[in-house]
Amino acid sequence: MRALLLCNYYDADAGFVGERFRQHGYSFTECHRERRATWPSLDGHDLVLSLGSDWSVYWPHVESEVSEEAAVIRTAHEQGIPVFGICYGNQIMAHALGGTVERAREPEIGWYEIVTDMPEVIVPGPWFQWHSDVVTVPGHAEELARTSVGPQAWRIGTSFCTQFHPEVTEAMVRRWIEGGGAEEAAKHGRDPDQLLADTRRNVAESRPNANAIVDWYVESVVRG
């Protein structure tokens, strides 16, 4: 089965989520947001996976990139091609399908417990988060999990997304910190070294938790 991986060229790692989709038989074509002219069509593809980004959908200087990715997500959704979004992928899916995205009243950076309506699939956590934006879900969506800041998971048909990062690995968090995230984390009162220590402690548990979400998505949502 063929899947499109929508991502930034400098952060194209789908981590545990990509690993599990591959175990279910999917192969990915990377589609870099900065090089969208090279994206293939949706024809013959069975899944769209939209990853996180340090972008915000309302930034004026990425308006064309946001518009074109939103169009891909909207078209896939309308054609019944499953779409799975993570963090920024969640935000652009909300933007594409009738919800809204705005600056959150406070960022979520680190490992957080969430309130879940499907604890057998989406466990309370902890889950890793790194974002400063919040969505309102489209009116016809089913919200599945949340924190005090905002929605954490929702779905419409075969489109599903999470604000938290089920895919995250220790290597990814280290890369984000070394790529400028240390300053951002410190600005918001988070200790980068503690973020890494917490990640080392939690990834052994978060990996099977991520697998459970992908298994449910493939077996119950995609295949129905």
What are these regions (language model features)?
Residues 14-16, 59-61, 93-96, 138-139, ...:
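Short glycine-/acidic-enriched loop or helix-start segments at secondary-structure transitions
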Residues 102-108:
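Short, electropositive alpha-helical surface patch
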Residues 75-100:
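Catalytic nucleophile loop
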Residues 3-21, 31-34:
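N-terminal beta1-alpha1 ligand-phosphate binding loop
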Residues 19-84:
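Flexible gly/pro-rich beta->alpha loop and the following alpha-helix that scaffold active-site loops
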Residues 5, 50, 102, 116-224:
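Amide-donor transfer/coupling interface in amidating biosynthetic enzymes
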